[in-house]
Regions:
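Domain-core detector
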Residues: 1-160, 168-171
């Protein structure tokens, strides 16, 4: 963890610590603490299998966010976690089958194929997500530029925040 002291030591290498630098370093340290606390609460939520409202309350407790912001963050994190797990599990299974096929000199397994599903539960669904609902892609291929699956952490935020979509295994 990058502590305030470590950040301050790093800053002193380049310049003397000014009041502005001190304030900036304090903010960075606080953001890191909140980010870590939030990650812990999200993990606790998924381990406990509590209702979605539980995650909203956990987010509010850590961040002090309004109810609407906490709901948006909770929906975003649920989408990211659930679809990320589906993709991760599919990758692991594919690689296991691939290794077994290589050991036994058998035919390589087919790449898993996923279907994008927009459940239309959002008040204002993204037009791009509605348009690709039902589309199928092999694992790892993009459904939209930069978007491999709903909640993809490497995708642009405007494609993932408050997304209600999910992947369904098609093959």
């Amino acid at each position: 963890m990058m502590t305030r002291k470590k950040l301050a030591d790093l800053a002193e290498l380049a310049v003397q610590e000014s009041p502005f630098t001190k304030m900036s370093l304090d903010n960075l340290a606080n953001e890191e603490i909140i980010r870590r606390q939030l990650q812990v609460e999200i993990e606790k939520h998924f381990r406990s299998k509590e209702a979605a409202s539980g995650l909203v309350e956990r987010i509010r407790k850590v961040t002090g966010a309004t109810m609407n912001r906490a709901r948006t963050a909770a929906q975003t994190e649920r989408t990211r976690a659930l679809n990320g797990k589906r993709v991760s599990d599919a990758i692991r299974k594919y690689l296991d089958e691939y290794d077994k096929a290589a050991e036994g000199h058998r035919k390589r397994p087919e790449m898993p194929v996923f279907q994008w599903v927009n459940p239309r539960t959002a008040k204002e669904p993204r037009h791009e997500h509605v348009a690709i609902s039902g589309d199928k892609r092999p694992l790892g291929e993009e459904f939209l530029p930069g978007l491999r699956y709903p909640g993809d952490p490497q995708a642009p935020a405007h494609q993932t925040i408050n997304c209600h979509c999910y992947l369904r295994r098609a093959r």
